[in-house]
A protein has these predicted regions:
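Hydrophobic alpha-helical segments
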Residues: 1-197
Length: 197
């Protein structure tokens, strides 16, 4: 078990919907197909079982999300996960932060940047490039109307290409959406503490 910092953790969390979910027994063939295409664990996730009430929206959402987060080229997968964790931390989405912190750790083989994001996102990043990515993610999350050419120039200074900046912007934007769905339609479920007997 990892440490919980300001309510955030890299532990595996559950998520419980506050609205009714679709029972697999009652799901239409289209709903089942959308679940299968969305995520490997969609059929056991309250989040997907809630969103599949509107299968066409979930189909589109999953396609866009998967293309942004897993598509080839552009920003590295680890950097996308770092930005997503930073957005989730700023938005207060404990569940999304835990998932994407784990993915960053798996891809980057380290936890230092994630620990920094959980502790103080404004100063997080182990390199100038990571700090620029996190700062841009925070700015686009907290003050999108103030992001301008100087923010893009700061990313370029740290070596980000235009394709990488576009990928980063997409990752930040999709998490504005994902975090809001998670925060308004349910709640994270922390694992039960192990007996100390």
């Amino acid at each position: 078990m990892t440490t919980v910092t300001h309510g955030f953790t890299s532990d595996t969390l559950g998520w419980r919907a506050w609205l009714d979910t679709v029972s697999l027994d009652a799901a239409t063939p289209d709903q089942l197909a959308v679940l299968e295409a969305s995520h490997p664990q969609a059929k056991t996730s309250d989040y997907y079982l809630l969103l599949v009430h509107l299968p066409e929206i979930l189909r589109q959402r999953s396609g866009v999300f998967n293309a942004i987060m897993y598509g080839p080229g552009g920003l590295s997968r680890a950097e996308r996960e770092l930005a997503s964790t930073a957005v989730s931390r700023v938005n207060g989405c404990v569940y999304c932060a835990s998932v994407h912190a784990q993915r960053f750790t798996q891809l980057a083989k380290r936890t230092d940047a994630i620990e920094q994001v959980f502790d103080d996102p404004a100063t997080a990043g182990t390199t100038a490039r990571e700090r620029a990515i996190v700062r841009y993610a925070i700015a686009l999350t907290e003050r999108p109307d103030t992001v301008d050419a100087s923010d893009i120039a700061a990313l370029e200074t740290e070596g980000l290409t235009h394709e990488e900046i576009l990928d980063l912007s997409h990752a930040v934007a999709i998490f504005a959406w994902a975090n809001r769905l998670m925060l308004t339609l349910g709640e994270p479920v922390f694992p039960e503490p192990a007996d100390s007997a």
